[in-house]
């Protein structure tokens, strides 16, 4: 008979037990569940709600179970329905009747809410730790490439020259925002819901603040209905995970392109590439491609949980049992992706010579040529048209802007002088963009210093 079976005349059908069981997901929160129960039991004893000796026996029993869980000695039973019932059943088997007092003043609804808050906070901290490692790696690489010129792109067309450091720092900013999102999620989850009961709190004189103190929470939830029915913290985490996976996916997309014969900007390490079963020459960036694909999986987790929650009346509904599968899938996918991406990036080789040659092609200095005319008194719209005509001329003549003669330049506008070549050199084009946020080496160096401070503050 189930622990809640007093009102029922028969046990649940075996099909129902199997369909309803969530032990597979629940066992991942076993430690949090036991830690929550330890705090609850201590508070019950301190408040005199249960005999002190029973509270002490419960604490000893739970500590023993926790030790066995950490040692991998516990096998959970599907017949006990979920992790909460498993722990309570095992506790009662070990310490006797006192174990039946653990659930005093508590419902599984607020018990699982507490577990959820704890695992959300734990996972946020783990993810932020992984992000900090990746950000540190990107910053280290950026420092090495302050002067490595490469083309910047819009519409995947050569636009203006930048540096590899500047490009990498764009992703540093993305991942810093991701880390702040996870810290915010942790802050939002930092409310202790135990004491909410099934939905309407409890008549027992629980000291909720004491439980929060024992578990390291900063505050308690203020409404019992919301305390048991909210899954915002899981949604916040999966949303943050979706954003982070999107950033990883964009980076992976660029690495797939850069690894291609058409770009040749990077060389993937053999350990992070695969071959073809028929084409012996192939070296495929499969890991980066797979990470792109897994991004959609995390998006799916977000939509799935939003859909679970969208029509639920207050307070608890069984639909919410689906929350942990979506949460864990998103967390596992993201954390493993961060680990793999960091290792893949650390092993890559950048072909800086190819990047520089590419930056010299494609008229990436055309804007600087127009700016040159503006500095000599030509209106920008006129300068834009003149340089556009110059580019069309170069394409017909098979030349670059650097290869035009002074006479050819003056054919389009007399404002062109001999100093135009210095104005459109790669180093000048990059170095002139020295305002904060620009690609000039000194600007990127300042951005790196700023990012290091942000990283230290996470």
Per-range role (PLM):
Residues 1-36, 97-98, 279-458:
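Glycine-rich cofactor/substrate-binding loops
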Residues 49-50, 74, 263-264, 379, ...:
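Conserved hydrophobic residue
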Residues 117-128, 143, 151, 157-311, ...:
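Charged, flexible cofactor/metal-binding loops and thiol motifs
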Residues 1-201, 206-213, 274-275, 286, ...:
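A helix-coil-helix interface module used to build multimeric assemblies
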Residues 53-58, 133-137, 182, 258-262, ...:
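Short alpha-helical "patches" and their helix-cap loops
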Residues 41, 62, 138, 241, ...:
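Short alpha-helical scaffolding segments that buttress acidic/His motifs in well-ordered protein cores
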Residues 40-50, 163-166, 235-243, 368-377:
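Short, well-ordered beta-strand elements within core beta-sheets of diverse protein domains
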Residues 45, 69, 142, 251, ...:
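Hydrophobic residues in alpha-helical segments
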